[in-house]
């Protein structure tokens, strides 16, 4: 099991569009993946679960993965968060 924290810096946090990119990326991996915020943990492959966390700009999440490709999964999802889900910061 692998865990890593990440802080959302995109303008609107984890709303519908970034959450969709996030779960699409998470679903590329075989590992079980969760997102945790404020002691609440949801399946990272579930759009409703991820949206229900209500993560806003500056919010910190913990990514947790368990499985054969856990390292790759965490690295890919952290990269997605750190690059603002491909959104411009205008």
Can you annotate each of these PLM segments?
Residues 1-10:
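Short amphipathic
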Residues 8, 39, 62, 66:
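Generic anion/oxyanion-binding catalytic loop in active/binding sites
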Residues 9-48, 52-57:
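Compact, glycine-rich, soluble single-domain proteins
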Residues 56-90:
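C-terminal structural segments of small proteins and small subunits
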């Amino acid at each position: 099991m692998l865990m890593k924290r990440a802080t959302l810096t995109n303008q609107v946090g984890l709303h519908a569009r970034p959450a969709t990119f996030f779960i699409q990326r998470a679903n590329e991996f075989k590992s079980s993946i969760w997102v945790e915020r404020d002691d609440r943990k949801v399946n990272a492959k579930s759009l409703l679960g991820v949206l229900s966390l209500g993560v806003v700009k500056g919010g910190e999440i913990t990514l947790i993965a368990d499985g054969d490709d856990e390292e790759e999964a965490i690295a890919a999802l952290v990269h997605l968060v750190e690059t603002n889900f491909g959104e411009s910061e205008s």
